[in-house]
């Protein structure tokens, strides 16, 4: 082992050594130094006076945002970079963890590298004009990601975007879904990481000179140079707050602060749709435990550090357009913190700090950010399981993902969730985010020969429409299969263009600087409208579905398409997804597998491995608006079921049947995640608090139960609340300033939703029996 320098000796005193001291290996550090905790929550401390004062100050701004549905303030003059803004504070004298995206709390910045039109539109919507100098620079001199994408898009892709058969593509905003290993800055200090990056850069010289994979080698060398530069700027930004982060952190406060500065660099330089925080709780616990044992801090002070970190994560803001908000409602950032789970060696990764992170929901009230994500295992300590159930019942603010499914799949216990349901190994994998394709609309294209049922224009391949008086399942399925081939090709082509241009014009240097040199990439496609498509095909197969044909007119009343199936008459009953009926559940599983296999056949940018999610965020409302009447009886414009959820009100056999249907969806063909949002009224869980906690924990054990022959569910949002409370919150928002609920893949402050989105949430199934 090489000799440690004096700063490393000081910072690492008392830690068990290992490979982590020679190489960047945070997992090795954690495994050799963390303390599993199987006790209860009785050790937890309440908020300090400083925490309460700071949070009250922040809440004043949040209340204004909720009321106005607008930013508190934004800077329309300064393109945001790691070092663009002067230091900002809530109250410098009270903050234990410092750092804001701009110079004022909740003030937003502009990020024009992704696209100048979106920035200009955001400014205009909120009554300001983008600085003309910025517009000139990013129009005449500096090409943006958005411009690059639209220079290359095909007419077919543009039609798919217009119709809504592809929606939410990250072609005008930051793609996100990349998790920097922010822990590295705390463990090693920036100087060590810069030296490591220079070694990576130098390691490519021979390949460069020999012409090995020439274009890829040149690109990677340039990217590493940008990463090295970003680390230098990170150091500069931290220095503006009075901190020298050249060397490793020496105590818990520094470890949290160093780590947060690294994340702050990411969110100052990128406005990705999901800017996840990673898996930090157990790492932080190592430092807190060392300080507690040395008598340097008390439990109250430890909790205060965690509260102040979480407070900062609650304050992340980006300037968005109303169109973006329709897709991703309620200002989500997906500052996802992944906690708990089990280690490969059988020890739990639950620590006291896992409890502290969840306890912030009590010390500062509920909040949608950070997106607290619990990796559930049947082997988790019983005390922790009961505490999780208590938190869900009290706050409806956390989500659960199946560690027993994903840990063996990765053969790794240091993965985290990006955004909502997307797992990746921290610092070693990244994702090319791909939004989602509309399977319900694809089915209508199959029936109508590629004519869009809303616009009347030819979007899909021009084929003869199905003219049968009663739809035949085999005929429809054959056509559907062909249209899924077409859609997969349009989808992957669009994503290849998007991610080539994002790498070229809006590269995430600050995030990728905290990754290994050679990164495993996934191309994360997605599907929406699964339950609509499955129920529609079930209706065609098991009932009688007669198309009602008619003309489609444009907004001026001109006929643009004739003899199009614009509605459907259904005779008889049909099995509906969400009731543990294999007749329809098998159709849903087939659609997932079928579309994934089609995507897997196609060539991807940077040889990214194709994956797929069943996830909608809140775009289930937008998709519904863009999709006409469907053969399952759903009316034109009505929202889809979110994520992998059954359609609203169709899961009629109770919680277990609904959960069982969703758990059947094959993770092997949806490794980017399968989102299920579950709402249950408190009384359905039990008559008293103890019974409710026990039953909810048991329900999750059952849903996530995983073995070789029976796959467990992958994801579960849990809401425990009554519909009446949500109705009251719609009418009296001031009574519920922090009311938080789970929606597809994330949490949202109920008051930040539009009335239409609130109504969609209220009309969803609230399970009243197990």
Swiss-Prot record:
This is Formate acetyltransferase. The lineage of its organism: Bacteria, Pseudomonadati, Pseudomonadota, Gammaproteobacteria, Pasteurellales. It comes from Haemophilus influenzae (strain ATCC 51907 / DSM 11121 / KW20 / Rd). Its EC number is 2.3.1.54. Residues 5-635 form the PFL domain. It is an enzyme of class 2 (transferase). Residues 642-770 form the Glycine radical domain. Belongs to the glycyl radical enzyme (GRE) family. PFL subfamily. GO terms for biological process: glucose metabolic process. One of its GO terms (cellular component) is cytosol. Its main location: cytoplasm. SUPFAM superfamilies: PFL-like glycyl radical enzymes. NCBIfam families: pyr_form_ly_1. It comes from the Bacteria. The gene is pflB.
């Amino acid at each position: 082992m090489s000799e440690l320098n004096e700063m490393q000796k000081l910072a690492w005193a008392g830690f068990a050594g290992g490979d982590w001291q020679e190489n960047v290996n945070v997992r090795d550090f954690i495994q050799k130094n963390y303390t599993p905790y199987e006790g209860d929550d009785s050790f937890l401390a309440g908020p300090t006076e400083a925490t309460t004062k700071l949070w009250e100050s922040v809440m004043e701004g949040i209340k204004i945002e909720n009321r106005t549905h607008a930013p508190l303030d934004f800077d329309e003059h300064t393109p945001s970079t790691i070092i663009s803004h002067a230091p900002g504070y809530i109250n410098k004298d009270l903050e234990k963890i410092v750092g804001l995206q701009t110079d004022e709390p909740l003030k937003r910045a502009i990020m024009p590298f992704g696209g100048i039109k979106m920035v200009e539109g955001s400014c205009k919507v909120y009554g300001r004009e983008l600085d003309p100098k910025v517009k000139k620079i990013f129009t005449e001199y500096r090409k943006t990601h958005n411009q690059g994408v639209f220079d290359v898009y095909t007419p077919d892709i543009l039609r798919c975007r217009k119709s809504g058969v592809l929606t939410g593509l990250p072609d005008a905003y930051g793609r996100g879904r990349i998790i920097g290993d922010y822990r590295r800055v705390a463990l090693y200090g920036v100087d060590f990481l810069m030296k490591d990056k220079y070694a990576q850069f130098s390691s490519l010289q021979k390949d460069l000179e020999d012409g090995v994979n020439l274009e890829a080698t040149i690109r990677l060398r340039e990217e590493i140079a940008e990463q090295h530069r970003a680390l230098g700027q990170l150091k500069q930004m931290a220095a503006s707050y009075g901190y020298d982060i050249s060397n490793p952190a020496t105590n818990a406060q520094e470890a949290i602060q160093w780590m947060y500065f690294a994340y702050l660099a990411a969110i100052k330089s990128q406005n990705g749709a999901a800017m996840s925080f990673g898996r930090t709780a157990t790492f932080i616990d190592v430092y807190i435990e060392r300080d507690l044992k040395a008598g340097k801090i008390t439990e109250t002070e430890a909790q205060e550090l965690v509260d102040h970190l979480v407070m900062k994560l609650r304050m992340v803001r980006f300037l968005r357009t109303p169109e973006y908000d329709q897709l991703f409602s309620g200002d989500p950032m997906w500052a996802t913190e992944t906690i708990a789970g089990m280690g490969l060696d059988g020890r739990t990764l639950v620590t006291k700090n896992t409890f502290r992170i969840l306890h912030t929901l009590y010390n500062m009230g509920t909040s949608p950010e950070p997106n607290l994500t619990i990796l559930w295992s049947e082997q988790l300590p019983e005390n922790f399981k009961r505490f999780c159930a208590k938190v869900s019942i009290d706050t409806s603010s956390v989500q659960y993902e199946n560690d027993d499914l994903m840990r063996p799949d990765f053969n790794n216990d240091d993965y985290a969730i990006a955004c909502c349901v997307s797992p990746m190994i921290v610092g070693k994998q990244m994702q090319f985010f791909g939004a989602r394709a509309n399977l319900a609309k694809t089915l209508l294209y199959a029936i109508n020969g590629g004519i869009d049922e809303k616009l009347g224009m030819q979007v899909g391949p021009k084929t003869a429409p199905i003219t049968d008086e009663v739809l035949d399942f085999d005929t429809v399925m054959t056509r559907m299969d062909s249209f899924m081939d077409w859609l997969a090709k349009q989808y992957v082509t669009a994503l290849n263009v998007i991610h080539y241009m994002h790498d070229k014009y809006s590269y995430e240097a600050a995030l990728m600087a905290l990754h290994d040199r050679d990164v495993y990439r996934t191309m994360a496609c997605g599907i929406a409208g699964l339950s609509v498509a499955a129920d529609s095909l079930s209706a065609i197969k098991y009932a009688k579905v007669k198309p009602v044909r008619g003309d489609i007119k444009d907004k001026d009343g001109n006929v643009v398409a004739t003899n199009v199936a614009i509605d459907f008459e259904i005779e008889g009953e049909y099995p509906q997804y969400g009731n543990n009926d294999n007749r329809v559940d098998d159709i849903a599983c087939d659609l997932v597998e079928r579309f994934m296999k089609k995507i897997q056949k196609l060539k991807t940018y940077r040889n990214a491995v194709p994956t797929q999610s069943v996830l909608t965020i809140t775009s289930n409302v937008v998709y519904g608006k863009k999709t006409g009447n469907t053969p399952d009886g759903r009316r034109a414009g009505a929202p889809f079921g979110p994520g992998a959820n059954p359609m609203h009100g169709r899961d009629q056999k109770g919680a277990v049947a609904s959960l069982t249907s969703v758990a059947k969806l094959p993770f092997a063909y949806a490794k980017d995640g399968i989102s299920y949002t579950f709402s249950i009224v408190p009384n359905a869980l039990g008559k008293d608090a103890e019974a409710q906690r026990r039953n909810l924990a048991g329900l999750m054990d059952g849903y996530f139960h995983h073995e070789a022959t029976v796959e467990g569910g992958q994801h579960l949002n849990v809401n425990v609340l009554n519909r009446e409370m949500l109705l009251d919150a719609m009418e009296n928002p001031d009574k519920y300033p922090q009311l938080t609920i789970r929606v597809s893949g994330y949490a949202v402050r109920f008051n930040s939703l539009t009335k239409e989105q609130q109504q969609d949430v209220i009309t969803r199934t609230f399970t009243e029996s197990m």
